[in-house]
Each structure stands twice: as C-alpha cells, then as structure tokens.
C-alpha cells in the first residue's frame, strides 16, 4: 500500500503562441509599398486597388499611398475591402 498519494496525469498544460493577427495599418494612415496592412486567417478583408494578398491571406500595399476601407456587396453579403489611394 502506498503511503504517498501518486501524482495524477493531465491532458492539459499546453498553449500555442499568439499569432498577432489583425489590422496593422488603419484607415487614413500612410503606408509604403510592401507594408503589411492586415494579417488574417481566411479572407475577412478582400484586397482592393493597389493591395496584394499573400499566401497566408495577409494583405499588403503594392504602392505607396493612404489606406482606405470600404464595403462591397458580393454573393448576397457585404464584404470589407482595403484599398490604397495614391
């Protein structure tokens, strides 16, 4: 018979690092070409004029200018779009 209580095992105790997603440059901000505007998983925001989309759905500026947000109706729902105004 044990005189000490054995330690139990648990399936918890892990946590992933934060991915630092979100808007990095807000509307009206000046950005240079190549600047990251939004880090996202999936396409919550669509790329508009002078905005490119990376393979991980990150939106970045193709040209220097000012960030602008608007919404467009697409497939019976409103989608958010990011543009760079020169």
From Swiss-Prot:
Coiled-coil blocks: none
GO cellular component: cytosolic large ribosomal subunit
Keywords: Ribonucleoprotein, Ribosomal protein
Start and end residues of each stretch annotated as Disordered: 1-23
SUPFAM superfamilies hit by this protein: Ribosomal L27 protein-like
Entry-linked Pfam families: Ribosomal_L27 (PF01016)
A GO biological-process term: translation
Any GO MF annotation of the entry: structural constituent of ribosome
Highest rank taxon of the organism: Bacteria
InterPro entries recorded: Ribosomal_bL27 (IPR001684), Ribosomal_bL27_CS (IPR018261)
Family: Belongs to the bacterial ribosomal protein bL27 family.
The name this protein goes by in its record: Large ribosomal subunit protein bL27
Organism, as annotated: Prochlorococcus marinus (strain MIT 9515)
């Amino acid at each position: 018979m044990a005189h000490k209580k054995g330690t139990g095992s648990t399936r918890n105790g892990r946590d992933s690092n934060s991915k630092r997603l979100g808007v990095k440059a807000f509307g009206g901000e000046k950005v240079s070409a190549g600047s990251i505007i939004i880090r996202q998983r999936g396409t919550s925001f669509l790329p508009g004029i002078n905005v490119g989309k990376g393979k991980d759905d990150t939106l970045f500026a193709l040209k220097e200018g000012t960030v602008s947000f608007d919404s467009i109706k697409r497939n019976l729902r409103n989608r958010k779009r990011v543009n760079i105004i020169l």
